[in-house]
Amino acid sequence: VTGCVNNSNMTSAGNSKSGIAGENYGTVRKSENNGDLSNSGNVGGITIENRNGKGQALLFIDDYADLSVNGEISECVNNGAISGKYDVGGIVAENYSCGKIENCANTAEVSGSMTGGIAGRASGCYKKSGIKNCQNSGNITAQGSYGGGIVGELINGLVYFCENTGDVNVENCNS
């Protein structure tokens, strides 16, 4: 997926919501979300899940998705307010299984339980995945226990050359 733009506000009571792609096992590049997204589950400005999908089936697709095995998001921007109940990120709700996020930015407010300016939750394999050269300037509010300017919860992943200038407010103590 390259050069896609979402300008629509979306609110639903379903499980997950994103501006560009549901689950990404491919590449999303130079895409932008400008719409406010709100949902009772996981929410990501660009995708819900980003992962390396070697041999896995694509389970569900939002508006635009590409099936391959890369799991890469690059040069994407979120400008819309993002709110959800669980994993919530300005770019992606969950970054798993060697997924890469590079050169992306979030400028909007993000709120949820496990909440980050770029990713709500990130885990993967060392040296093969991570979040690189990303910026967050939006304010982060974690109603649960994990919140961060870049990632809400990081397990076995890498974050490098990233910058947060937004405020981070966490209601519980795991920040």
Question: What is the predicted role of each segment?
Answer:
Residues V1-S175:
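Predominantly extracellular beta-rich ligand-binding scaffolds that present long acidic/polar faces
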